[in-house]
């Protein structure tokens, strides 16, 4: 398993998964190298998207594994590789988030992430269950 920085060749795959992104956003992923495709046996199996908060904290704001590749440890491996990449770039801590009704929070805690807050977007254009944030010192 490996993760590779998103290129223009990955656009159809990434945009079929991430419904939050438009053409401008995708071009930004490529330009800033803030997106990764997760590969297993020469197949695209998922994506990771991150941004850098306050110029010094990588925040993984999207992780998705295709249904047929779930429960095989790919998300765990991808997160560990991503963390190592962020550490190699000199970052000291990472953030991850997920909705309170999603199971990913259990994986994040198993990987050493600590709950550090949440956001509620009730009665806004972004209405959703609470978003829980996790931090990890690298």
Q: Where on the chain are the PLM-derived regions?
A:
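Short hydrophobic clusters on alpha-helical segments that form packing/core surfaces
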Residues: 60, 82-86, 104
